[in-house]
Amino acid sequence: KLVCNHTGSNMLDGVAAAFVLAAKNNGKLDADYASIEIDEASTVRVFPHFKPDYMVLTNLFRDQLDRYGEIDITMKLLDRAMKMAPKMKVIVNGDDALSAYLAMESGNVYVTYGIPGQVFDQKETGEIREGRFCKRCGERLSYDFYHYSQLGSYHCPKCGFARPEADFAAEAIDMTHGLKFEIREKQGRVTPVEVNYQGFYNIYNILAAYSAARTGG
């Protein structure tokens, strides 16, 4: 059985409400797992009350800026939260330099997912992107290609920080009718995926869910 804040309430009150609603009349919780979406700033308020076994870190985009002002603020909040749960395993989108840096520097055990091959002909663009500079040394990152926003194949020419090899990689992508691709795990297992969803971003969503399920056993 699963506890989930499916209504989308992802701050402290909403997370608490999800557990309350899942409890029986006697107050006991009859559940095997909890899959909870938590607002970035709320992680530091939620984690003192329970320590997750796993955290999925998808990306750090500009949609957080209207609430927190700067990506750096969001990163500091997430870093504080991860330090509150040192035994928590992080499942991170390695195609995002900001998220990957957070996971690498956290001290937590982490696994990565991503799309290693170039899908679109997008090597340069005027689009505003976060994470143009290496968080480790400040040098401008060099990209072999972009998928969208700052997601892509990056490396730092100065300190060597680079996109990690994906533990779970989406390959053989076909978006002609819905989404069709393969998920290749580092140890060799290949799982075919075919869904009616549209949108390249949904490949990342499916990868994140698959990676979390496989990592959690």
Question: Model-found features: residue ranges?
Answer:
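Phosphate-binding loop of NTP-binding sites
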Residues: 1-116, 122-133
